[in-house]
Structures are given as structure tokens and as C-alpha cells.
Amino acid sequence: MGTVIEVEATAMLVDPNQGQLKVTGVMEEEEFGRQGRTMRRRSQARSSVDNVLTVLKTSLGLRPQDYDIHINFPGGIPVDGPSAGISMVTAVASALTNRPVANHVAMTGEVTIHGLVKGVGGIVPKVRAAAEAGITKVLVPEENWQEIFQTLEGIEVIPVRTISDVMENALLQVTEQVPVPITARHHSTLLGASPKISSGIIP
């Protein structure tokens, strides 16, 4: 079963290099089994936030360190796994550049520190959830592309390889230069494979 989750981001301009980051709605730790033992580690969703900040600076040329940034996953569904990577980048980039996210687009995918989009689990349930929610365009990692996606009606599934591909398909162009406001609120739509946490995917 899949689900559609909104990702919110706000950005408030502060003194240079004095920005702070807050993330809410994600699990701080996760449990996983290995060789008959149950172990705990920092959640992959929380860890992927570090990748997001790096990509914003190195791949998109932005300065998140100059803003107080708040990323939130509303709705009471605890988020875990790396699949929220490109959604978080998109939401924050939207807030920093004042370019709105297209409201008919949803996405899923892990992002590396080099701005590459990596494959995730549960891709078919995620795409189906998007279609059922009325989404007309879905961005998926190129590694997850399947021929069956070409047969779906009413929804376009686009494979993406880099975070630049994501920005091109997710952010709307503005007709004139608009200064970034002191506080900007933007959101993107994340696809989850299940409303419950299961190891390794975002569920």
C-alpha cells in the first residue's frame, strides 16, 4: 500500500552563516535486525537531511547556512528511510529561491552528496498511490524505472538521474525576478510505500 505525504519547508533570512536547521515529523532513531540481533541507529530520514544541505550548496549553488530552515512532515505519519531526500531538497530550494513547486507533482528518491538520485524501495505502490491521489506527474529515480509506467493512464512517470533533473520538473519558472522574502513557506509532495515504517524505505 502506498501513501502521499506533504513535505513543508520555511526559510527565514538571518545573519550570514548563522542559520539553523529544524526537522520535525521524522523518526530520530530506527531499529533493524541483523544476525539475530536488534540494533538501533540514527534514522536514515534524519541522516539524509545532512545530504540535503550539502546538495543545496554544492549542486544548486544556494546558501542554506544564511537561513533558519524548518522542514516538517505533517499529518502524524512518522517518516523514516532515505526516500524523502529529493522531496526535502525541492521544498527547501523552493523556499530559498521563491520558485513554487508544481502542485500536480509528487516524487520519491534518495539524494547523494554529489546530487545524484538513487533508487528506493516500494516504487510501484508509491506510483499507484500518486495516481489515486490525483497526481499527474511523478518523479522517480532512473534506477527504479519500469516499462509498466508507460501504460498508466492519467499520470506521467518521469525518471530522474540528478537533482537538477528534479528541479527542472518540479519547480515552476517565474516570469520575473522576485526577491526572496524574509520568510518563505513552500512544500513538495513525497510518495511513501506504506503509512507505517518499514526498514530501509520511506515508507
Show the residue positions of the predicted features.
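Peripheral, non-AAA+ core regions of ATP-driven protein-machinery
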Residues: 3-203
